[in-house]
Amino acid sequence: MTYRTDQATDLDTTRVGDTTTVSGWVSRRRDHGGVAFVDLRDATGLVQVVADPEEIQIVDELRMEYCIKVTGVVQERPEGTVNHEMLTGEIEIHANEVVILSPSKPLPFMLDDRSEIEERIRLRYRYLDLRRPHMAANLQARSRLTGAIRRTLDELGFLEVETPTLIRSTPEGARDMLVPSRLRQGNFYALPQSPQLFKQLLMIGGVERYFQIARCYRDEDFRSDRQLEFTQLDLEGSFWTQEDVLVTVEAVLKAAAREIRDVDLTDPFPRLTWQEAMDRFGSDKPDIRFGMEIVVLDDLFEDTEFGVFSGALDGGGTIRGINVGSRELSRAQADGLVDRAKELGAKGLVWIQVSEDGSLRSPVAKFLSDDEQSGLISRLEASLGDVLLIAADRWKTVSQVLGGLRLDLGRPNTQDELAFLWVTGFPMFEEEDDGTRTFSHHPFTSPVSIDEMVSDPDRAISQAYDAVLNGVELGSGSIRIHDPAVQRQVFEVLGIDEETAERRFGWFLEALEYGTPPHGGFAFGIDRLAMVLQGEDSIRDVIPFPKTQTGVDPMTEAPAEVDETQLKELGIQIRAEVIAAREEAGE
């Protein structure tokens, strides 16, 4: 049996008179004037099939999503029936034979992009959801994206190498996904959060340009752009400076934009230091498609009598504001902004609106001098009707509050713009909530100054960089430490004693002793890049079989219990309190 000679969109007016065989699904069926019209859909698109039910009686049995094979003759559509919204809208197939390859149960939802479907239902029947046109387009775009990446890196002389997925646990910021060993009971593998150490080992091994489209795993809390398992482009190069990395990654991202959006990005991406990004946009992944930048107001209020502002400055804090433009602002809306600022970490928020007569409408206006009021209008470039939002607190709090409000209230001029950006010069270390020190990127990142890292680690700057697109962090990279002595110093600053460092990383520290070349690299999420380029709000719409935000697969019902026999083979016993909690939850 021949299932097809053509796919749907292979057919056009140049094929009129040809006999063709196509296979696919019944997307739509309607009867008109004693003739049946069937829209047959395959992976390429739709083609209309015309059949006479009296001649081909099986047509009466066709229902939505039946899988069928049609043989017939390609004909031009009659005048007045051409459909310019279909690629095949000028032709139709006059059927000689229709074969039902597989019937379909009644559908749980319409496979129509116009239908609003609860996401959990979509994931429960993901195999049906993937037939919807926009989901099919997303998968096709993702395939083209990875193809463009591979072609670009191949042209640049990179070697594609696979690294292990059963590795030793070396936590990199999130919890590891652990895999118990049957042969060495009580021991565990980890699934890689990234191929970080193995790609560095490849540099030590003389593979000067490496890349991999790698599956990675992180047991972390979910957001719209997070999954337990994800795909990233991972690359590394020997004898590279930061500039070498950025230029290479730009070439890859430009190829991706050209492939998916048909856009040529010719100019170098803008660059901001981490400090500049936080000062101007209140974010280390700023969306630069619109302005609304944060403005420093400290000097304007250095002699203020307004206690909130003077108290912030006396306490070593800062006063900053943003102009969110002309908009209606009722008291309820103003209260909503204050509540939102508190959610973001502020104790409060000052809001001011420039009235039609040029005066300032605000609960705090009476506490501000004439010079302070006119200075605000000038500094924030305010016009009639504009709303000004001002925060006074520690620098970190003010930045995250105004940065969050900026994203809530700002809108890009167009959703089609691709605003790529590099953020460089990240702090080497961060402070945890409990006061302990942790790494900003990962502990294998090289500092700009080794001396400063040792003498004043909280002020040390790393050779790390992030790529940002439309406010979404695509990925990050760094120049790596290639001196084992420096690597040990970093561990020491992080509070990792020598014994712990040897136990967890001794094998890697030894490798660094064998003529390690200077090297650096980068990794970015394929899922996130595909999401932004396709204009989706969630990476779940560009992943074939994703998990929900609670880490569940509604289709297979993973994660699930396993047989007691399997647990015994692994030397694992589920604690009684876990079993009790599961039973109480009805699981």
Language model features: what each stretch is:
Residues 1-587:
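Class II aminoacyl-tRNA synthetase catalytic cores and aaRS-like
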